[in-house]
């Protein structure tokens, strides 16, 4: 995985695998990973936001998106996404700011049995 600036869609870190090996160059394309602009980023965000409206009971969902020549395509949605990969890529914890934001936006109480807010 690699860190992505959610506001711009620009990759902000080197790639990193689960063995903590880092990649400056993409292993398939050979392109330098940091600085890559993900294509049709705004369209991808809109696609995810619209799809999430069909699942309002889930405050947090993990979206796997493919960037194709025809635009972004949802591969799958995860009801209980693991934050490990995002923290692993950036080498910093993400939990507190995200959960503070979710609590404010959702105005709901966390239910550990359902893993939802």
How would you label these PLM feature ranges?
Residues 24-46, 53-58, 67-117:
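C-terminal active-site "lid" helix and adjoining low-complexity regulatory extension at the edge
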Residues 21:
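Acidic, metal/cofactor-coordinating or nucleic-acid-engaging core segments within structured domains
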Residues 62-64:
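Short, surface-exposed charged micro-motifs
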Residues 1-17:
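Phosphate-binding site of ATP-dependent enzymes
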């Amino acid at each position: 995985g690699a860190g992505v600036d959610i506001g711009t869609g620009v990759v902000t870190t080197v790639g990193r695998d689960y063995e903590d090996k880092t990649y400056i160059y993409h292993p398939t394309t050979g392109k330098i990973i940091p600085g890559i602009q993900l294509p049709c980023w705004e369209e991808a965000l809109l696609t995810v936001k619209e799809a999430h409206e069909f699942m309002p009971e889930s405050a947090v969902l993990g979206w796997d998106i493919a960037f194709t020549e025809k635009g972004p395509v949802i591969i799958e949605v995860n009801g209980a996404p693991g934050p490990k990969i995002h923290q692993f890529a950036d080498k910093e914890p993400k939990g507190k700011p995200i959960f503070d934001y979710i609590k404010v936006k959702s105005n709901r109480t966390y239910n550990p049995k359902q893993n939802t807010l």
